[in-house]
Every structure is written in structure tokens, then in C-alpha cells.
Amino acid sequence: MEENFEPYTPQLLKNPLSYSDLVKKGVEFEVDNSQQNHARDLGLDSDSDSDYEDALDVDGEELRSPWTYSFDELRALMSEIDENIYKRITRTGHVDREAVPNKARVSVRYSGYWEGETAPFDSSLLRGSKFVFETGQGTVVEGLEVAVRSMRPYEQAEFIISYKLLFGELGCPPRIKPKADALFKVEVIDYSLIGDAKGIDAIPQEDRDKFCVVYPKAVDLHLHGKDSVKLGRYQSAATAFERAVSSLNYCRMANDEEERKQTELLTTLNQNLMIVYNKMNKPKRACIMMKALRHLTMGNPSCKALFQEGRALAALGEYNLARNAYLQAQAKQPANKEISDEIISMNKRISKYEEASRDIWARAFSLKNSKSDVRKTPAQLEKEAKEQDFNDKMEDLIRRFKNTSDQQVSFSRKSYSNAQFDATCKLAKEHNLKLTLSPIQEDVLTLSKPDVKFA
């Protein structure tokens, strides 16, 4: 009699686990069943339990093992990294880039093969995407990380890795053989430094005013902040940049060179904070950072800083000041189309606002022909003008958001009155967008496109 098997989807874990813990001492884990519907929405359902049947678009030659003879013969053609890893370079990487360092986010393509077998027991190609991990975190088997750490961006290489640095003597049958060395074919696509967000906490209190001690840790915080921005974690990025600024401001410099390095890094950090604050819809903080930048640059901020100042001022409704900031940025980069587009947008906003103001005040001081008409006070008319101005700004922001690749943007609920919140809800509905209030952070409003799925 045939058995009926239900189609399955990949199961997500409630908490992540590392391969190193799995191999060394074993781990317990729980499956998050609530994610099954999301897997179906993303097209991850499959009636097949074979990785190969799901990889129809992958070239079979790419998946085929580059060596099907004994590993001893291949080792003779390789260079020894250490007693457990042998390497053969098949494509040279970028010579002007260093090998993958510790504390880096690296993206690779790889396939792993058992001795004498043509098909891989594991391959990122079967999943149709690159594999990304952080070095130094123990999230991949030790042998693969050591191999990747020996490579430069763009490099392709083959490695024979001892079972001692892979899955140990027991393995995980039937897919992972016990006490088996493996051949790995690896390509490093690129890497970026992620820094160390906690390194600065280890500085002794008596050394926290010494520039030579603090500066490397501030650089680490800067790298961590940049990495957080790439991942869309703007609050984490802001915290990292703020801590770096605070630590540098507290330092005493011993010479002109240290002062130059401090000013250079503080300038970069404050510019990055302006970008992050604008992303977080905190324009007032962005303007505060601009004051610090003007002091650091002796009144000559960069084009990037002026552009971000323009965005912050526009968000605050200071259109004339925003246009002036954009014009100063344009003077530094006349050919920059993005700046030109913002200037045109500001000119339209200013004209529209001035026209609306003239119309409101004209109605405020004109005589009504009909006595039955209810006359509005200048204060009421001014309130209507502000409400209309808010609606225009919010609609413009929503239109710009719809035209970007971003899937969601967050706001602070406390920044809006109840009337403004109601108006925003109405506009979001008109534009077929979702406006949700976080159940965890009550102050966070999220505007998202209809195809965004939340866990």
C-alpha cells in the first residue's frame, strides 16, 4: 500500500545554532512552525525532497566534482596550508585586496564533495544564491572558515579539508559520512569589515582619554555602524556612530597628526549620523550633527553633508533653508542629478505653499456675499493651511517611497498629532500601502509595501 507524504517546506529554527556546537557537543533546537505559510508565500513549497530536482537552472558541470580520483593524488598537486588543509588556486583573486580577515561579512559560493563522488553533498549553488557568513563567529565548520580566510575577493580555489576540521569522526549519516575528508570548491565574491561593537567597552577607565588606545576601537565602531546601515539596522548604526563620536571627543591628542586623524574620523561619523537620522525620520538630530560638522570643517562642509541637511530641513518644513542647502551642495557638484531634482522639488513646494498661503489670507480678509456663510477666523484658516501642507508633504514622501526599492520605512508615532496620524492612515490606504504600529515598540510606525511579509 502506498504511503501518503505531505509536501514540506524548509523549517526555520526559533533560535540559531552553530555548526561548531553541533559537531563538538551536540545541540537542542526547536522548529518555528509559524513560518510555514511565509515559506509558501515565497514559493518555497516543493513536492520533491531532492536538492537536485529543485536546482533545475544550475549548470550540471558547475555541480560536478573537479576531481574524482583519490585525494592523495590531488594533495600532491596542492599547497599545504597546515596539516589538515591543502589548497589549489584555480583563479587568482584581486591582488590589491587583502585575504578575508577576522570580523568580516563574506559572501561565497561553494560546493563540497566526498572522495570519489561526482555530485556534491552540499552546495550553495543548489540553493540558487551565494552564502554569507561572519568570520570569527563559529557559524560555519572550522575547516571551511580557515579555507575562506586564506582567499582574496574574486579568487577561486579547491581545498581538501580533514574530517578533523569538518564533521569529526561521527559525521551525520547518511548525508555526512563519518571520519571523511572532503573536497571543497570555493569562490570568494567579496567581503566587508563589520568591526567590533563591544571592543571599546574593554578599554580600562584610565586609558579612555588616550587617543592611541581609543582610536582603533572607534574605527571598529565606525565599521560596525556601516555594516548595520547595509543591513537596514539604522538604530544599531546610530548607536555605534554615537559611541564612536563620544569616545573620540573625550580623547586628548598628543600631536598634530593625532588631531588630524580625530577630525577626519569625526567628520565621517557625523556625516554618517546625518544619513542615519534622516533614514530614521529624526531631522532635528540631523541638523544638530550639521552644526558639529560646520565646526569640524571650519564652515566648509562636504557636498554629502549639505545634501543631508537639505533633506532634514525639508522634513521640518523649512523649504527655503532646504533649497539654500541644496544650492550650496550643487555648487560643489554641479553635475549631480539627484541634487538638481531635489532643488526642482523644493521650488515646487515653495511655490505651492506660497500660493496656498495667499489664497488662505485672501479668503480670511475678503467679505462673504452670503450672510449664511460661516466665517472662519484667521487662526482656523492658518490651521487648515498647516494641515494641507502636512498632507502635501506626506503624500510627496509616500510617492517617493513607492518609487524606491525600499520595502518599508519607519516613523516615530510621537512626532505626529492624532489628526496627522489619521491623515497618514488615509493616504496610505489611498496608495495601497500598509501602516502598522509595532506591538513591541509603541512609538514605531511602519509604512510598507503590500508584498512585505511580517513574521
UniProtKB/Swiss-Prot annotation:
Q: Which GO terms describe its biological process?
A: meiotic cell cycle; oogenesis; piRNA processing; primary piRNA processing; secondary piRNA processing; spermatogenesis; transposable element silencing
Q: How does it assemble?
A: Interacts with Hsp83.
The GO cellular component terms are: cytoplasm; P granule; Yb body
Effect caused by changing residue 335 to T: In PB70; weak allele that only affects female fertility without affecting male fertility
- What are the Acidic residues biased-composition ranges? 44-54
Annotated source species = Drosophila melanogaster (Fruit fly)
Q: Tell me the InterPro entries matching this sequence.
A: FKBP6/shu (IPR042282), PPIase_dom_sf (IPR046357), PPIase_FKBP_dom (IPR001179), TPR-like_helical_dom_sf (IPR011990)
Q: List the taxonomic lineage.
A: Eukaryota, Metazoa, Ecdysozoa, Arthropoda, Hexapoda
What is the consequence of disrupting this locus? Recessive female sterility with no effects on zygotic viability. Some strong alleles (WQ41 and WM40) also lead to male sterility.
- The molecule here is called Inactive peptidyl-prolyl cis-trans isomerase shutdown
Question: Coding gene?
Answer: shu
